[in-house]
Amino acid sequence: MSQSKEDKIRSILEAKNIKSNFQNKENLSEFNEKKASKRAEDLLDVYYNTLSTADMEFPYWYNREYRKSDGDIPVVRRAKALKAAFSHMTPNIIPGEKIVMQKTRHYRGSFPMPWVSESFFVAQGEQMREEAKKLASNTADELTKFGSGGGNVTESFGNVVSIAGKFGMRKEEVPVLVKMAKEWVGKSVEDLGFHYEKMMPDYDLKENLMSTLICMFDSGYTLPQGREVINYFYPLNYGLDGIIEMAKECKKAVAGNASGDGLIGMDRLYFYEAVIQVIEGLQTWILNYAKHAKYLESIETDLEAKKEYSDLVEILEHIAHKQPRTFREALQLTYTIHIASVNEDAISGMSIGRFGQILYPWYEQDIEKGLITKEEVIELLELYRIKITCIDCFASAGVNGGVLSGNTFNTLSIGGLKEDGSTGANELEELLLEASMRCRTPQPSLTMLYDEKLPEDFLMKAAECTKLGSGYPAWVNNSNGTTFMMKQFADEGMTVEEARAFALGGCLETSPGCWKQLTLNGKTYSIAGGAGQSAGSGVHFIANPKILELVLMNGKDYRMNIQVFEPHNKPLDTYEEVIEVFKDYYKQAINVLERANNIELDIWRKFDTSIINSLLKPDCLDKGQHIGNMGYRYNATLNVETCGTVTMVNSFAALKKLVYDDKAFTIEEIKDAILNNFGFKDALEVGNYSMADQVKVDKTGKYDAIYKACLDAPKYGNNDLYADNILKNYEVWLSKVCEEAQSLYAKKMYPCQISVSTHGPQGAATLATPDGRLSGTTYSDGSVSAYAGTDKNGVYALFESATIWDQAVVQNSQMNLKLHPTTIKGQQGTKKLLDLTRSYLRKGGFHIQYNVVDSETLKDAQKNPDNYRQLMVRVAGFTQYWCELGKPIQDEVIARTEYEGV
């Protein structure tokens, strides 16, 4: 929106006594400034004042036991190492907590896993040592530097060393990390993966794709698990003792029995032994917290606090062994199991699933018995939100900033349908919404599985929540999701009933589930949970505009001076020839990245076997096989992730229009303009990463005409078939190409079309594009969002463009919209927001999410981050604190089209 138009709107609003320089205060006031409980607010303050901390306690005990168990069966050896690590975790209970335990001994933080990937720590070892040697200094300047990033420790200070641009580690622990990392050189999943990848004849191509950021990162050793839905059924139904007894009985039945396959039948014995070892470690971990709570009770003088510690002791001692009896016990157990799951591996996106339906049995029975009130439930859910927000994922700076933006994608799905096709909404899900409105934290993000059968008041409640500006719930088309389940998993026996059990894994990965029959106090309930492999551990983020760049540059990356692909040496005389070379390069990229990823994940499943997640999900316990042996019910989950789709579409449209249809410019003139960035500085030099505030250096006007023509060329998002058909043709082709790819489980793959935060770094690695985007600026976000400022014909024209193709045949698509808060003010505004959402989903859109925020607020927050510690925005499938986002993503969010009328 132009400054003059924005000023005019602002003056009109102010004339009516409506202030527009806010995020969502008008909408907040509608709901009487909903606030969290005093207890939750106090603990949220603890979170705000806590830095992300990395420590070596868990890895130390893991590594020590792993060495000690050398020579044992790999899966049992790993189980013993995990058992030792969990058993030795130092308990830490913050005063006022009713839900306890966390990833480490620190309130917020994580730990490195050099057995998965150690090269970063080895490479940075000397630098970290030097940082640790520096004299301690606690200057205000240093505090300000890392404070501006919220909980991120972006620079070293005092006795704290910054690692990966996010975590702080005490300097005395740094030598332990470096020493341990060196022990894993040549033996980690990462190093073994590199060793065997090099045996591929086209390994050099794979390395070129990685070094030029055409592919964002290797998933096999970076984030091998996650972007999936956890399953809490077995602990909730049987208790931990019950699972141990089950494993012991199964162990007796399978010992020495090959069961006819001659390959993995014998592995069942070792898997069941590993299950027993790990659960014993988890029980010790829980009971250590119970002992700590008992100690705190003994020294507490306040009678109310003393009673709370006593309650914690009883809860923890019970759930360490038995099925939970109450809602609070069930909530504590599911949270504990969740932390255990994400501590097992380098994981982001271990999503919670249909939580309101999973915990409903305990909620229903406690309410009926008068054991708990709705307000008490809401407070517990507020506390749960804070605990989930405390989860950090330890990864390299590139992954943390360039993909995760500090988020861990623990998505909670609401709505959808039950097994019998009736509405999945219930009273507990309404309370989950209420808790998220009162206690606005980035985690867990909510996703509404929209279905026409859901009650209107439930949907209105969700729309009210969205209006508050937290970015959630996002809205997903339940019908599309079940259709995709049936298509992708038909060969593995997917039924319509089972398809209804799906939920969102990670930020937006449609993930298969199943129904299990849970019995509580003699009453049986059907609950959903995850039943599939990682739905996001395939080829990680192909940069679509970068592939097109290399088509134009004959396979060469001029920024890096690397010949990535073999030169095609074609004159590109026709548009069809451009498309032909693009498809060839794209298929080459998928093929080599898919095979390299298969090698990495194969090594991961052999040496870093998942035990906790395996024992949780059907049908591993029934089969006696872990995830690596396809113990899960659904295994065709690995995908090909892409980024920058609309930037690519707009670029193709510009080439077609300007070079081949109108013949206004030659392909050589376009290439020259791109190499010279249309006469502008690179965004990296300027320090601004949207198209705003870029600096022109060419004074001759040589590129003015071609630059204007590129900007004026047809753009996606305006219901213009010239551009939109390019998207349609690409989507049809991409789906077929991905199905030709094969994961290590010999299953077909599929497209995953989300940007997360990759449109920032991948945009930074890309020259100017034919659509007029300048070098180093971010790509378009999502996959069907319009490029910032190019959707000129309103939101409904954008919806027409987005639904020109069948979005139900792929895992997902992503639509981000930014609305001015006054646009949806009041009850009518809530209805308007719901109608807007419905209109898109009814047209076949898969996903839509909103930022309800004034751009001026974001600009001020960028300049004065300390004044906006609690400000949250929706990025691309997830919500994050504004001050913890990198500037490229901040610039992109600010630049998004802001709709004042819908």
UniProtKB/Swiss-Prot annotation:
Its EC number is 4.1.1.83. Belongs to the glycyl radical enzyme (GRE) family. HPAD subfamily. Heterooctamer consisting of 4 large (HpdB) subunits and 4 small (HpdC) subunits. Also forms a catalytically inactive homodimer. This is 4-hydroxyphenylacetate decarboxylase glycyl radical subunit. The lineage of its organism: Bacteria, Bacillati, Bacillota, Clostridia, Peptostreptococcales. Residues 782-902 form the Glycine radical domain. Residues 38-774 form the PFL domain. It comes from the Bacteria.
